[in-house]
Design a protein with these regions (language model features):
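A short, histidine- and acid-enriched strand-loop-helix "catalytic/donor-clamping" loop
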Residues: 83, 131-146
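Membrane-proximal helix-turn-helix segments that form the acceptor-binding/catalytic region
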Residues: 96-103, 143-163
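Acidic anion/phosphate-binding donor-loop and adjacent secondary structure
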Residues: 174-175, 183-185, 191-208, 222
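Conserved donor-binding/catalytic core segment of Leloir-type glycosyltransferases
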Residues: 202-219, 224-236
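Nucleotide-activated donor-binding/catalytic signature segment of Leloir-type glycosyltransferases, i.e.
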Residues: 239, 248-278
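Acidic donor-binding loop of glycosyltransferase active sites
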Residues: 278-293, 308
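Conserved acidic donor-binding segment of nucleotide-sugar-dependent glycosyltransferases
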Residues: 324-336, 345-351
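A short, well-ordered alpha-helix in the C-terminal region of glycosyltransferases
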Residues: 345, 352-366, 376-379
Length: 386
């Protein structure tokens, strides 16, 4: 409204004009979406591994997709890893580390809940008020004792989302009241393909069949060595002296060791060096003990990325059907003759073995890789903002 005496806008008119102009300015300015800050909890060296990944010396899938998720507007606060032999001391340290940084993140992403238990209980009691998303490496089960089941139910209330490697774990978890379907997410965990592309550039193919076993968790080394004892083919074993209560040195030294079997004891986490060695072999062998989870999956996805055929124990928790996909041969648990036959088949059919390797690589490129599962994880974690 105009003041007819002064011919100048009234105060109300000025306010309206200013508001309109301000609205036009705001519309023209594209306000960037703020990144979601997430606390990244890992059970091994975190920042150091990330820096190695940036240099191409560490595979990103062992960081459980953290580098890939940065593409989707997630900024990570790294957990300051420290090793503790005592589980209680670990839990207390993790609790202090999380509470100290609580104001700097909106959610927690964990590769395992080991060490995070006190944080999860606080969240369940409403004292932390922070969404927690964690990988669950086995199925959620119901305790036989009510005194164990009751605190367990409280514990799982503190977790907003769980990521699983295979559908079988989800199906088994759904039998428990602690695992409602909306909390369970199947993720196509797979290799950091560009990392292995760099490895393969300098790798050379063996002139004779070379079989290799890596990994240290629940491996059936006894069956594997017995299978190779009467075969002419070379087997290289890379394994820790002891892991998870199994003394592999003792197991190996109790077996006859012919000249075609070479054993190398490893220390620490050396994925880059092991990948270089595996890339120059003919076939990856994964002898597993019978446990209800994805024993050997890390070794398996590495073989996919390197385009190598597989011989594995028939682990029904693997996310893919190895025989059906045509990427290798599976053998029943503890079947020495079955292993020997599979090795002879791969060695005697090199063209078919190469085809298995090509199909394995294609599976990594299309389905099981860090680009795919990083996006899947980010979609779940980012969903709380929508």
């Amino acid at each position: 409204m105009w003041n007819t005496l002064s011919k100048t806008p009234s105060p109300c008119g000025c306010l309206a004009l200013c508001t309109k102009a301000l609205h036009q300015i705001v519309v023209c300015i594209k306000i960037p979406k703020l990144k979601m800050k997430v606390y990244f909890y890992h059970t091994r060296l975190t920042t150091e591994s990330y820096l190695e990944w940036q240099k191409g010396l560490f595979p990103g899938h062992l960081l459980y997709g953290q580098p890939e998720m940065e593409k989707y507007g997630i900024e990570f606060v790294m957990h300051p890893y420290r090793h503790f032999p005592s589980r209680l001391r670990l839990m207390l340290y993790v609790l202090c580390a999380v509470l100290k940084r609580r104001s700097s993140f909106e959610a927690i992403y964990a590769t395992s809940f080991r060490g995070l238990e006190l944080v999860i209980f606080l969240n369940a009691l409403g004292l932390l008020r922070c969404p927690i998303y964690t990988w669950h490496h086995t199925a959620v089960t119901t305790a036989k004792s009510v005194w164990r089941e009751l605190p367990s139910r409280l514990f799982y209330r503190g977790i907003q989302g769980m990521f699983f490697f295979c559908q079988k774990h989800i199906d088994e978890s759904l039998k428990s009241v602690k695992a409602p379907a909306h909390k369970l997410h199947l993720v196509h965990w797979g290799p950091d393909v560009p990392f292995y592309d760099g490895i393969m550039k300098s790798a050379s193919s063996p002139q004779v069949p070379v079989f290799i076993s890596t990994g240290k968790e629940n491996r059936d080394i006894q069956t594997l060595m017995q299978a190779f004892a009467n075969l002419p083919h070379r087997l290289d074993i890379y394994i820790a002296e002891e892991c998870g209560g199994i003394n592999y040195r003792r197991v190996i030294e109790s077996q006859p060791k012919p000249d075609n079997i070479n054993v190398h004891y490893t220390e620490g986490v050396i994925p880059h060096r092991l990948a270089q060695i595996v890339a120059e072999c003919s076939c990856v062998v994964i002898p597993c003990l019978d446990f209800p989870y994805t024993v050997g999956l890390t070794t398996l996805v590495e073989a996919l990325a390197l385009g190598l055929p597989l011989i594995t124990s028939r682990n029904t928790y693997f996310p893919m059907d190895i025989d059906k996909e045509g990427i290798g041969i599976t053998v029943p648990y503890g079947d020495v003759q079955g292993w020997a036959d599979a090795v002879e088949y791969i060695a005697g059919h090199p063209d078919e073995a190469r085809q298995m390797g090509r199909r394995a690589r294609l599976l990594a490129e299309k389905v099981y890789n860090m680009e795919v599962f990083g996006r899947e994880l980010a979609e779940v974690i980012n969903s709380r903002q929508s």
